[in-house]
Amino acid sequence: MAATLWRLYSKSICNSLQGIILNKPFIQKQLLLSSRTRSLSFSSDSQFGSATAEVCSNTGLKTGGGIIVKEGFLRWENGGGTCHSSAQIYSSALVEFGAVVHEKAVLGAEVHVGSGTVIGPSVDIGPSTRIGYNVSISNCSIGDSCVIHNGVCIGQDGFGFYVDEHGNMVKKPQTLNVKIGNRVEIGANTCIDRGSWRETVIEDDTKIDNLVQIGHNVIIGKCCLLCGQVGIAGSVTIGDYVALGGRAAVRDHVSIVSKVRLAANSCVTRNITEPGDFGGFPAVPIHEWRKQIVRAQIANKREI
């Protein structure tokens, strides 16, 4: 950075620019955007290409800012990742080498993006969110202080097809987004599909284990717990404080009210309208499920 500024100074590119750079910090550390920002841009030659940057005064937000590595993409100075020149990234955000941030993405203050991660166009990530390695995020907004573990995929198309009048398999359009609230944690290799007729939503403080599948148009309330290998089909609505045990399944287009606990390996095939504990296939109130198990053991002359 010092060498670049010195070359700008020695070549006398712009006298007014010299005064701005020498008398003001290059990046101010404020976290809030100002509607009265003004832009400062500069360029200089380098052995890797032309270095370009655009800095908004009165804010820590920055677009561009590094060595050009491909048309429209720059090497981000904090971590060495590759970022599109139109992406808006706070100077305190860390984008590790090997990560890619696409056009018009927004990364808030103190965001950490791990190597191999791809942040798609127009993705919005809130402050202090940590994203692991080899994550794919597209068509999505993520709130503050979230944790996204390695291998997560968010915002890809949901599984929607139909057979037309000619017998051809046709894909249903998947055009909406995923909206993730604040302080959400998503375990490794979990997949969350984008919406088709409504957004896929995960509300604040929900925690999701590894290897969970969440289909398109699903709405999950706040403070829910989803254990490993849970599968939720499309267009499901889940209330607040719901806990789904490991390998539990929920069929499409059903609703689960708040404060429900579902036992491991259970399957919800119809709406659950009252809070409580449920289990079995199909899921029923837990005491009924236990009676079913006892009857089955007696019928088969097994010891209880």
UniProtKB/Swiss-Prot annotation:
The record marks 9 as: Participates in a stacking interaction with the uracil ring of UDP-GlcNAc. Pathway: Glycolipid biosynthesis; lipid IV(A) biosynthesis; lipid IV(A) from (3R)-3-hydroxytetradecanoyl-[acyl-carrier-protein] and UDP-N-acetyl-alpha-D-glucosamine: step 3/6. It comes from Arabidopsis thaliana. Its EC number is 2.3.1.-. Residues 1-47 form a transit peptide. GO terms for cellular component: membrane; mitochondrion. One of its GO terms (biological process) is lipid A biosynthetic process. Disruption phenotype: No visible phenotype under normal growth conditions, but plants lacking LPXD2 do not accumulate 2,3-diacylglucosamine-1-phosphate. This is Probable UDP-3-O-acylglucosamine N-acyltransferase 2, mitochondrial. Belongs to the transferase hexapeptide repeat family. LpxD subfamily. Keywords: Acyltransferase, Lipid A biosynthesis, Lipid biosynthesis, Lipid metabolism, Mitochondrion, Transferase, Transit peptide.
